[in-house]
């Protein structure tokens, strides 16, 4: 999944899956795009188109959508399903999907991979189906049509599928659920209803050995652009005052603020493997990666 909005989860999961395939002795190609999220690939790459938010012209979307994300404007728009997320990012735009599918199909014809792994990429699922290549991928309960959907946003996808003689379900989320296997990097307690052909795989990385380091800080991550920056920073300041410790706020612009004898350090990204072993608490937006990272380090 590539998008103009800042979202580290899809790329980090794709990197982890690619690393596991590579460590198992397989050749891997990572499909990526110039979206500001894909960086430092651990395998050879294939560049694919990046969708324009809401299908806007590229010149407009490249600047306006990241700005809206940084200002937290995206967090002010109610989003009621993952299908709406795909629509907002432009992933349901018919022209984009056609272009991405053709790039992917051309590569598949040339390389004939044994399997395609889709990280919430409709284009990858459609291309693999068209080329007769098995397709598996990531999944979660909130991304199923049964959880929430908005089929009106997927008219272009249905038209594209019908042209290719493929089943065209009402919701594009059903297309993602149609993969041969959907791997859920979570657990039944957190996501009990994930649909058919789903396999819970828990942590994507080996859980770290807990070393008993002093718990001397707190970590805040409320999504990149999911809420206004001021809300995230204010949360960090309140935590520093309440807990009497340093706080790190991820997903916002770089800054350092003093709160009494402690500091609130803000940055777009932090190395969670360095901070979570020290964290007394992790305040986050409920994302799958954040939930599992907190569990793996035994952080409330």
Predicted regions, residues:
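Active-site proximal beta-strand in glycosyltransferases
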Residues: 115, 129-145
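Acceptor-binding helix/loop patch of EC 2.4 sugar-transfer enzymes
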Residues: 73-87, 139-164
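A short alpha->beta transition loop at the rim of the catalytic pocket in nucleotide-sugar-dependent
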Residues: 132, 279-280, 298-300
């Amino acid at each position: 999944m590539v998008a103009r909005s800042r979202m580290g989860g899809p790329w980090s999961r794709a990197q982890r899956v690619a690393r596991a395939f590579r460590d198992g002795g397989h050749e891997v190609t990572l499909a990526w795009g110039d979206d500001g999220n894909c960086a430092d690939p651990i395998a050879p790459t294939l560049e694919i188109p990046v969708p324009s938010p809401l299908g806007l012209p590229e010149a407009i979307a490249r600047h306006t959508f990241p700005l809206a994300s940084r200002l937290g404007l995206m967090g002010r728009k109610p989003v009621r399903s993952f299908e709406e997320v795909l629509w907002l990012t432009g992933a349901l735009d018919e022209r984009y999907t056609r272009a991405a599918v053709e790039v992917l199909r051309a590569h598949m014809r040339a390389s004939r991979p044994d399997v395609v792994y889709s990280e919430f990429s409709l284009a990858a699922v459609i291309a693999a189906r068209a080329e007769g290549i098995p397709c598996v991928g990531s999944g979660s309960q909130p991304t199923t049509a049964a959880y929430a959907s908005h089929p009106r946003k997927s008219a272009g996808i249905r038209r594209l599928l019908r042209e290719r003689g493929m089943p065209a379900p009402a919701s594009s989320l059903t297309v993602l659920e149609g993969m041969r296997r959907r791997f859920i990097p979570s657990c039944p307690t957190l996501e009990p209803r994930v649909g058919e052909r789903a396999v819970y795989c828990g942590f994507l990385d080996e859980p770290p050995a807990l070393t008993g380091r002093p718990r001397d800080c707190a970590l805040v991550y409320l999504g990149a652009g999911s809420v206004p920056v001021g809300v995230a920073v204010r949360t960090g300041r309140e935590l520093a005052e309440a807990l009497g410790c340093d706080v790190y706020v991820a997903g916002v612009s770089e800054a350092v603020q003093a709160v009494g004898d402690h500091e609130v350090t803000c940055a777009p990204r932090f190395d969670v493997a360095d901070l979570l072993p020290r964290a007394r608490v992790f305040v986050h937006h409920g994302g799958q990666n954040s939930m599992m990272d907190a569990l793996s380090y035994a952080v409330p």
